[in-house]
């Protein structure tokens, strides 16, 4: 359809393409940007760019796609793009975003983190504001209905007073840990006090170490983000404890809802007991995100979260934390 919003995809790795190369009909789940755009009723994927020649050869089987190994050349083939998606490695985001404004897209959707440092992020946001380019960062849990419901339950006090949020994660702080810093930021705001404990780096000497962060809020809530390294099996566990209930989430697959009940044997004591389980439909996150972008572009509906809010996480780890030395 010629009236669809035109999209360019920069980066066709796992989240860009590899995790879901399908072009199924509208309404199904999608685990890559390629699949989510292809299924959308509002968007048309016109061009893709990647430096991997094998991936490009695979994508060339789709006659409707313009495939390039240079994203600049791809963007230069049209006078105007409605949406440009950046799904490249984290450390490349700043350079790409700094140049994208020259091509004047209406909107840019970039994978988290926005950038590796707040100074670069501030510069990018200012440039986009000056050019009138909308910017959205993909913190995927914000586009999952199950997490939105969790936030509402917490804010409405249905689990009592928030006491503790503990998260274990593998991988780097910026690439994986930021998901959960953002979750705490979304649910509780920024902490009053925080400390960071540097962890292990990747064998390729990446600066993105698997750090541990401990935060305290004015309310007394404790947030513990615990990095368990790069070499362990993929593991993300979230546990929340409130005075009247809680929940646990393992690997973003399902929520175990808990409630506070009296202990049968020990009078006067209470425990958290599993109330029900709820599946998390992770495959709907990207379709939901693209619906939000379409509403923004077609109906001028503002994004619920602006890019400056995302930079609060970078500022937190750069300026707001006391960095403690590692112990041997």
Where are these regions (language model features)?
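N-terminal Rossmann-like dinucleotide-binding module
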Residues: 1-62, 294
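C-terminal helix-rich "cap/oligomerization" subdomain common to oxidoreductases
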Residues: 1-5, 49, 83-86, 122, ...
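Nucleotide donor/acceptor-binding cores
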Residues: 3-5, 106, 133, 163
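Beta-loop-alpha module in the N-terminal Rossmann-like domain of NAD(P)-dependent dehydrogenases
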Residues: 51-54, 58, 63-128
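A contiguous active-site-proximal alpha/beta segment in oxidoreductase catalytic domains
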Residues: 83, 114-173, 325
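Hydrophobic residues in well-ordered beta-strands that form the structural core
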Residues: 109-110, 135-137, 249
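Rossmann-like dinucleotide-binding domain that binds NAD(P)(H)
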Residues: 161-239, 308-311
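NAD(P)-dinucleotide binding in Rossmann-like oxidoreductases
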Residues: 203-204, 219-289, 303-306
């Amino acid at each position: 359809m010629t009236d669809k919003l035109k999209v360019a995809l920069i980066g066709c790795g796992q989240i860009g393409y590899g995790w879901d190369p399908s072009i199924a009909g509208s309404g199904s789940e999608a685990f890559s940007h390629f699949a989510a755009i292809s299924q959308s009723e509002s968007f048309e994927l016109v061009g893709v760019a990647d430096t991997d020649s094998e991936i490009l050869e695979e994508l060339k089987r789709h006659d409707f796609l313009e495939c390039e190994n240079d994203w600049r050349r791809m963007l230069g083939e049209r006078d105007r793009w409605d949406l440009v998606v950046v799904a490249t490695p984290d450390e490349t985001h700043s350079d790409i975003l700094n140049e994208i404004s020259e091509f004047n897209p209406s909107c840019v959707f970039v994978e988290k983190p926005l950038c590796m440092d707040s100074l670069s992020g501030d510069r990018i946001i200012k440039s986009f504001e000056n050019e009138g380019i909308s910017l959205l960062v993909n913190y995927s849990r914000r586009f999952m209905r199950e997490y939105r419901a969790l936030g509402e339950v917490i804010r409405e006090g249905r689990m009592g007073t928030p006491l503790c949020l503990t998260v274990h994660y593998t991988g780097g702080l910026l690439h994986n840990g930021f998901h959960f810093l953002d979750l705490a930021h979304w649910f509780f705001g920024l902490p009053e006090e925080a400390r960071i404990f540097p962890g292990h780096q990747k064998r390729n000497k990446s600066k993105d170490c698997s750090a541990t962060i401990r935060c305290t809020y004015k309310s007394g809530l404790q947030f513990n983000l615990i990095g368990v390294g790069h070499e362990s099996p993929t593991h993300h566990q979230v546990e929340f404890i409130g005075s009247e209930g809680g929940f646990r989430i393992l690997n973003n697959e399902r929520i175990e809802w808990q409630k506070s009940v009296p202990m049968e044997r020990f009078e006067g004591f209470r425990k958290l007991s599993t109330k029900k389980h709820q599946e998390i439909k992770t495959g709907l996150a990207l379709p939901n995100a693209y619906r939000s972008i379409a509403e923004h572009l077609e109906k001028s509906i503002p994004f619920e979260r602006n890019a400056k809010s995302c930079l609060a996480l970078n500022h937190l780890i750069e300026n707001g934390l006391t960095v403690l030395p590692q112990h041997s």
